[in-house]
Regions:
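Short, charged/small-residue-rich alpha-helical element at the C-terminal edge
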Residues: 229-302, 307
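Catalytic Walker B motif of ABC-type/P-loop ATPase nucleotide-binding domains
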Residues: 158-162
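Conserved ABC ATPase signature
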Residues: 133-137
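ABC transporter nucleotide-binding domain
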Residues: 176-262
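Conserved catalytic motifs of ABC-family nucleotide-binding domains
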Residues: 154
Length: 307
């Protein structure tokens, strides 16, 4: 990894009046990473992205993109960064091709950028929409144009803020495939998403943000490995599930349960033996390891309990 992070966040805080949106956040995203920024609604993810992109001024701390301070050297920092916003922001009267060429011009890119724009249109399946006005596009097509806008100046660092929000399954798959292509070609990618199974599949490292603070930064593999639970799904007949298991059980159907078992104190064999001793006949059984969603819920619930 390069000693200079792609994104270097140092002691960043942001307050809106009496509300603390970010509280002394430190975060480094390394060059070449596909990094996930995860958290519940209102956790501070979009505020942090706004500060990184220069759209929001931090109350305290500093941010650098590829070593360029976003305040002291903001022009170079912004040229190094492409951001796909969560909201659909566009001029309804411009054609798609004009929107992209104007966006390139903001970064000092002239006609030499047009072949790259054509390539983006092709890759994002927008070629037949190049002369359509933005207001005439579907929500999914507008989302594709926003992605193209973020890439017209070939930024080495790309931030995708909920890029698949409100899109159908087919487009979601297309966008994630494109994110993988960008990453494979050398881009550093930072994404936020509520589809945690996709973050687990795509990202090498993730940060979980809650109440304006970084709860954890780790590889997805390490996060999953240190989760203290495993899950047992059982279909029972005869006696119902014993009361002692109910606080850690979730009903999945008629006398079908998923039990959340502590790895260190509840060995699988002992649990099955206790069920049989209680008169339960086990009709079906399946186990699963924790997912990133399980870890996410565990960490954010801990924060809620502390609060």
């Amino acid at each position: 990894m390069s000693p200079t992070p792609a994104i270097d966040v140092r002691g960043v805080s942001k307050r809106f009046g009496t509300l603390t949106a970010l509280d002394n956040v430190d975060l480094q995203v390394w060059r070449g990473e596909l990094f996930g920024l995860l958290g519940p609604n209102g956790a501070g993810k979009s505020t942090l992205i706004g500060i990184i992109s220069g759209l929001v001024r931090a109350t305290g701390g500093s941010v650098a993109v590829l070593g360029h301070d976003t305040v002291q050297d903001f022009r170079t920092a912004r040229r190094s960064l492409g951001v796909v916003p969560q909201e659909l922001v566009f001029d309804p009267f411009f054609k798609v091709i004009d929107t992209l060429r104007l966006q390139a011009g903001y970064y000092g890119c002239g006609r030499e950028a047009w072949p790259w724009i054509d390539e983006l249109l092709e890759r994002l399946e927008l070629t037949d929409k190049r002369h359509a006005t933005m207001r005439g596009l579907s929500g999914g097509m507008k989302r594709r144009v926003l992605i193209a806008q973020a890439l017209v100046h070939r930024p080495p660092v790309v931030v995708l803020d909920e890029p698949t929000a409100g899109v159908d399954v087919e487009l979601r798959r297309t966008l994630w495939a494109f994110a993988r292509e960008l990453h494979a070609s050398g881009h550093t990618i930072v994404l936020t998403t509520h589809y945690l199974e996709e973050a687990e599949d795509l990202c090498s490292r993730v940060a979980i943000v809650d109440h304006g603070r970084i709860k954890v930064v780790s590889t997805t593999r390490e996060l999953l490995a240190r989760h203290p639970f495993r899950f047992l799904r059982v279909s029972l007949s005869g006696a119902p599930l014993p009361e002692r298991f109910r606080p850690q059980a979730e009903a999945c159907g008629d006398n079908e349960w998923e039990l959340k078992l502590d790895r260190s104190t509840q060995p699988l064999g002992r649990v099955l033996e206790e069920l049989r001793d209680a008169g339960c006949r086990i009709e079906d059984i399946a186990t699963r390891e924790p997912s990133l969603e399980d870890v996410f819920v565990e960490l954010t619930e801990e924060a809620a309990d502390v609060a």
